[in-house]
Amino acid sequence: NMEMLLSVMNDVAPGADQSRWKQLETNLPPYLYDDTGALKEWATTAFDENNEHRHLSHLYCAWPLMETRGNARLTAACKQAVENRKSENEASHALVHRSLIAARLQDRAALTDALVNLMNHKIRYNSLMTNHDYDRGSCYCTDFAIGYLGIVHEALVYSNDDEIELLPALPESGFDRGTLTGLKTRNRATVTRLQWDLAAGTVQA
């Protein structure tokens, strides 16, 4: 990703010539939107959208990048793209990806829906290893075993280089109150303790 490359170069080689990469960035095609308002998977008019396809990789701009932050149109387009591909619910890794994107988009309903599917199906083994499918009918897949913490972190604390937001995408059920300790943010700060209680209307950090 060009944005990530330039950001890294600014940190590790601030005096380096970036003209080549900036020129390449200007050659990248703009985002395109389909007739539902969703972000298109391919930045070309040569292909129709295939919303039966299992991946949401074109929402890279939402997660792990942060291009949707402060961009209402792109945020709405990504939310619509998630909605259009709701049929992909049989793979645990797809639900993990959907959850991470929903949390970044602060879409509590979509996040809750994905988490309910993850938690209420037979994905986990007694060993706490997880399966590729949600009926344990396939092979081992570590995405959920590793990714669940990332989902919770994204839902409870958003951070970037100069910003921290608490409870940006709290799921609609199961998270009415809780405590989180020792979370490292992207700007090198540490949330030593986050405690919330929705019934009491309190958040402390």
Language-model segments: residues:
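Aromatic- and histidine-enriched alpha-helix N-cap/loop-to-helix transition segments
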Residues: 55-60, 89-96, 106, 140-147
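Non-catalytic C-terminal accessory modules of carbohydrate-active enzymes
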Residues: 109-205
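Stable alpha-helical elements in mature extracytoplasmic
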Residues: 1, 5, 17-20, 74, ...
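A broad, structural surface signal
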Residues: 3-7, 22, 26, 83, ...
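Well-ordered alpha-helical scaffold segments within catalytic/enzyme domains
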Residues: 1-14, 60-71, 97-106, 151-160
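Generic detection of long, well-ordered alpha-helical segments
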Residues: 14-18, 108, 142
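Short, contiguous acidic/charged loop-to-helix segments that flank catalytic cores in large enzymes
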Residues: 52, 84-89, 102, 135-143
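Extended glycan-interaction surfaces of carbohydrate-active proteins
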Residues: 13-92, 113-129
